[in-house]
Amino acid sequence: MASQGTKRSYEQMETGGERQNANDIRASVGRMVGGIGRFYIQMCTELKLSDNEGRLIQNSITIERMVLSAFDERRNKYLEEHPSTGRDPKKTGGPIYRRRDGKWVRELVLYDKEELRRIWRQANNGEDATAGLTHLMIWHSNLNDATYQRTRALVRTGMDPRMCSLMQGSTLPRRSGAAGAAVKGVGTMVMELIRMIKRGVNDRNFWRGENGRRTRIAYERMCNILKGKFQTAAQRAMMDQVRESRNPGNAEIEDLIFLARSALILRGAVAHKSCLPACVYGLAVASGYDFEREGYSLVGIDPFRLLQNSQVFSLIRPNENPAHKSQLVWMACHSAAFEDLRVSSFIRGTRVLPRGQLSTRGVQIASNENMETMNSSTLELRSKYWAIRTRSGGNTNQQRASAGQVSVQPTFSVQRNLPFERATIMAAFTGNPEGRTSDMRTEIIRMMENSRPEDVSFQGRGVFELSDEKATNPIVPSFDMSNEGSYFFGDNAEEYDN
């Protein structure tokens, strides 16, 4: 890991702040989520939502999406320049669900974007509070990560669907800033770069002229973000090659796919943060909790504590299992879609099932679904223990990259082995390691061959009782070492479609 001296913590990225001490960070993150909470309360008033309607996660998501849309400057500009019939570029909206005569009914609301921006700024001391908006984007991204597989997107860019554990944050909008870049997986960055290179190959003018210069700067910035996620010198050296290429093309795409595969064993450092739906912060603010005064962290006990005593509802379709819906949202709240199920189960205190065994579809309800048959139920988002979120990828204490089963990107800093199917992964590396990156490729393959599935990652790190807020007594869980726990493995989850 590069010396922490050069890195900002992700709370600092989250709040756009420069170096601050721990208390300042806790206060500014607290200010951010408090602002989200105040905004949510105000929106519930504006929309005349009852308490129960305000606790409905579908309503929370609609309100979050509306404010994100109101602040999406590029899209707003585009909509105003390309007016489409029957759509007002100055308005945004979505489904709001209300309880009428013992049934849930859907009502489509339209809201003025300018008005939404005013309410948001008012809740955030008159500021734009971009950090809060990014926070909502990351929550939506984590929800997508837990709900959908990206097999199609992977195949389209020439990657292998088994690399799905590298795809964290693949649905984050480009405008999500440093905090967004921190939570993107290696596969997500590789995919963005491949798309860019392909455009350059197909469009002669992509790298040319004034626009091309900006494109080039963006390309190199993305390369540096990806380089920063790798933890071995050889992987980083290969990224330098990709970044410095005069005219990126197929050779670079090959190198990037090679690097993505290598990240299945030599894992990248990807940040994880617990981002909760706006209604959860709203409930806490409404009950008189002062986030800024108390301080808040996205990677410590605070989100667990908040979820211990917030009651959130969800609409449930006729053949869905409410417990499974709860698991989906729990995983999204803790950014645990790519965590080992053994670890998640231990922390949650109930067995966490792989995606393919869940009887639940996504959280959002399509506009053509029948509301007559919709029920609602309380989401069970509590946990038995809490653990610190990691940004490391879990490399072993031998200071060389550790083994990782084909689809795990650790979320929690908890001791475990990362079992993996070496044969499966290494099979992807047949072929000729030649060309200008051959020595680096050889070195990377050697490191991968030397990693052992039984090596222990996060040595000595454990989970904590919910009463242990200072993290003084780590409980190091023991797992069945042979049994790996990948969430998407051998699975039939729906695809994510924009």
Swiss-Prot record:
Region (Disordered): 1-23
UniProt keyword RNA-binding, yes or no: yes
Extent of motif Unconventional nuclear localization signal: 1-18
Chain positions of motif Bipartite nuclear localization signal: 198-216
Localization annotation: Virion; Host nucleus
GO cellular component: helical viral capsid; host cell; host cell nucleus; ribonucleoprotein complex; viral nucleocapsid
GO molecular function, one term: structural molecule activity
Keyword annotations from UniProtKB, A to Z: Capsid protein, Helical capsid protein, Host nucleus, Host-virus interaction, Ribonucleoprotein, RNA-binding, Viral nucleoprotein, Viral penetration into host nucleus, Virion, Virus entry into host cell
Alphabetized Pfam families for the sequence: Flu_NP
InterPro entries: Flu_NP
PTM section of the record: Late in virus-infected cells, may be cleaved from a 56-kDa protein to a 53-kDa protein by a cellular caspase. This cleavage might be a marker for the onset of apoptosis in infected cells or have a specific function in virus host interaction.
Biological process according to GO: symbiont entry into host cell; viral penetration into host nucleus
SUPFAM superfamilies reported for this sequence: flu NP-like
Known function: Encapsidates the negative strand viral RNA, protecting it from nucleases. The encapsidated genomic RNA is termed the ribonucleoprotein (RNP) and serves as template for transcription and replication. The RNP needs to be localized in the host nucleus to start an infectious cycle, but is too large to diffuse through the nuclear pore complex. NP comprises at least 2 nuclear localization signals that are responsible for the active RNP import into the nucleus through cellular importin alpha/beta pathway.
Record-stated family: Belongs to the influenza viruses nucleoprotein family.
Subunit structure: Homomultimerizes to form the nucleocapsid. May bind host exportin-1/XPO1. Binds to viral genomic RNA. Protein-RNA contacts are mediated by a combination of electrostatic interactions between positively charged residues and the phosphate backbone and planar interactions between aromatic side chains and bases.
Protein name per its UniProtKB record: Nucleoprotein
Species name: Influenza A virus (strain A/Gull/Minnesota/945/1980 H13N6)
